[in-house]
Amino acid sequence: STTKAGGPSYLLGLGEVVPTADRNHEDAYQGHHDLAATLDARVSALYDAVRTHLDRRDMTELRRALVADAEAWEAQYGTGRDVTGLAWERNLLRYRPTPVVVRAAGGTHPADLVRVVAAGVRAGAFVSLSVADRLPTELAGALAAAGVDVDVEAPGVWSARLADLASSKALGLRVRVLGPREETAVS
């Protein structure tokens, strides 16, 4: 973790994120029908490109997640704020975009892929995506339009590239690995 010990986001790195109990997905975010007005245009295009490949539940969950991420961006992550409140100096807390390589292993759910990539795109980070399987044409086009570099790489090729990245000691580069839900689920 790169958070400052005792800092505002420190505890986030010490825990884990788990899904909440099943909710009524039909009623999720009924007030957000116009995603184009709520989401960054690039994120909205990613959602539009993938939603036809999702069932109703996954489509609703992804929509809910993208709206929640947009609200969190606007309220906390997308703006600098002085959390100290000192009158004689400014101590701005800012979240800065960091380059990220996202690896979607074979069987990665498309909603999971879009959620992670959309967060990076919204944050203004340089996002590079490595996928084991070819993406649907609409999604590949939306990713390209959002400025995401996409490479289709076999597992061995990805492993070699990851080893090269690790040995290069590229400062500030993050790697996010996604896989099939049944392999990554927390029990």
For each feature predicted by the language model, list its residue ranges:
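C-terminal segments
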Residues: S1-S187
